[in-house]
C-alpha cells in the first residue's frame, strides 16, 4: 500500500493554527512512514483527534483541523494527507472537498438529538439540500427517512462491540426514484447520560464514491 495513502497528517498549517501544531502532525507522519506500521498499530499523537476512513479499498487517517461553531451543532473539519476535507455535524456529512465527488453548501434543518431519535417508533423524515460537483448540480433537495436498525453483523467498525451501540439507517424517502438518490447511509451512536455521539458512519457522496469513518482510536 502506498505509504502516502496511509499516513495521517494535517491540521494547524492548513487550518490556520500555530506552526508547532502543524510540525507535530508532520513529525508523526514521518515517524509512521519510517516505522512502516499499519494504521491500526500506528503510534498516534495524543494531542490530535483522528478519523479512520476506508474508501476504495484504502484505509486512511484524517486529522481534525478545527471546530466550526454552528447554531445547530459544532462542525468538525477533518483533513487527509491528500488535502481532502470532510466536514461532519453531529455525525452527518455537511461537506466534502477533494474527493472524486464533492458536496458543498450542505444545509440541514434543526434535527432531534440522537437519543430522542433512538426512542422513535416511526421513521423520522427530514430534508437536506446540497450542491454537488462535478456536474454543477446546485440546490439538490433530498428527502430522507431515518430509523433504528439491529447492530450490523458486517461493517468496517473496529475495536468496539456493535451491540454496545445504537444503529440507524438513513434512506432516500422516495425509495431511490430520484436521480440524486444515493445508497443507504448508516450511523452507529454511543448513547450515555442522555447524550449521543456518532462513533461510526457509512456514507456515499455518489453511487461510485462511498466511504466509512470511525473515531480513532476506538473508544477514545
Task: Describe the role of every protein-language-model region.
Residues 9-12, 120:
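Processing junctions and N-termini across compartments
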Residues 7-10, 107, 159:
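Acidic/proline-rich low-complexity IDRs
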Residues 19-97, 104-105, 124, 129-220:
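Acidic, serine/threonine-rich low-complexity disordered tracts
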Residues 14-17:
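C-terminal motif of bacterial Sec signal peptides marking the signal peptidase cleavage site
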Residues 106-118:
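Surface-exposed beta-loop interaction hotspot
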Residues 1-7:
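Bacterial N-terminal signal peptides that target proteins for export
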Amino acid at each position: 500500500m502506498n505509504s502516502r495513502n496511509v499516513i495521517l497528517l494535517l491540521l494547524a498549517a492548513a487550518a490556520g493554527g500555530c506552526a508547532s501544531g502543524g510540525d507535530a502532525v508532520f513529525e508523526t507522519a514521518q515517524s509512521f512512514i519510517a516505522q512502516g506500521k499499519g494504521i491500526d498499530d500506528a503510534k498516534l499523537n495524543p494531542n490530535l483527534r483522528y478519523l479512520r476512513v476506508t474508501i476504495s479499498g484504502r484505509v486512511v487517517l484524517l486529522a481534525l483541523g478545527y471546530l466550526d461553531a454552528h447554531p445547530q451543532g459544532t462542525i468538525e473539519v477533518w483533513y487527509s494527507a491528500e488535502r481532502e476535507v470532510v466536514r461532519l455535524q453531529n455525525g452527518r456529512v455537511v461537506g466534502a472537498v477533494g474527493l472524486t465527488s464533492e458536496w458543498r453548501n450542505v444545509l440541514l434543518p434543526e434535527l432531534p438529538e440522537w437519543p430522542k431519535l433512538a426512542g422513535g417508533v416511526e421513521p423520522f423524515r427530514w430534508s437536506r439540500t446540497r450542491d454537488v460537483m462535478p456536474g454543477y448540480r446546485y440546490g439538490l433537495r433530498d428527502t430522507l427517512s431515518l430509523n433504528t436498525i439491529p447492530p450490523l453483523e458486517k461493517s468496517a467498525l473496529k475495536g468496539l462491540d456493535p451491540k454496545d451501540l445504537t444503529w440507524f439507517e438513513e434512506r432516500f424517502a422516495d425509495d431511490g426514484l430520484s436521480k440524486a438518490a444515493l445508497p443507504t447511509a448508516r450511523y452507529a451512536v454511543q448513547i450515555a447520560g442522555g447524550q449521543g455521539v456518532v462513533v461510526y458512519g457509512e456514507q456515499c457522496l455518489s453511487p461510485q464514491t462511498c466511504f466509512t469513518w470511525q473515531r480513532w482510536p476506538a473508544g477514545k
